[in-house]
Amino acid sequence: GKPEDYDDEKDAEKIIIGELWVTPKTFTSDVAETLSCLRKEAKRRRKLYDDNAQYVGEFGNYLHIIGYDKDKEFDKRYGYVPGQIVEKINGGNLQWLEIFIHAPFKEDVETSKDKDDKNIISIVMQFGFKIEDVKDIVCKAIFAGDAEHPVWTHILENNTDKDRLMWNILLAPHHCSWTFFNSTSNKDEIVDAANKILTDYQIGSNAHII
């Protein structure tokens, strides 16, 4: 809800989400009942932008939609697409973090509508962490939500910079589900994309999957 309605005493056990990131699927009517409050909040925030062409957001009202609106991008004030580097969070410049967006792709957004597939539009990102007095990124982490192997195939097909897929930390895709590896019950089968992500992009021998 509106951040100005937050009551320090009554709402003490609640948090204000300064900046909300969602996919286009959030705005459809078929989201799970448990996500209805998230959809309501995303719609509230989007309306602030759509009602005022000069609005650029504020803490508790910031919104970013990751992906595409059919065949076009969303309003650049709140839209992010694959290949984009995020430079600000909550209106402030990122000093110690660099975020690169890999997915969801335009074709996967459309597939999610046709097949009611929520996993195919998972947000996939690389976080690059920095420390003071060191110019280069010192740790890279990949976060991929519920992305299954077709998403990783698309990422590899579209990626033009190997560094953007390198990782010291990989959050286990799709909560350790086998669908990261293939679409069958054959656990001896590992699709090429999964194998490459796990072997070709791991940084050193101290990388971790969590």
Model-derived regions: residue spans:
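Active-site-proximal loop/helix segments of hydrolase catalytic cores
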Residues: 1-10, 105-205, 209
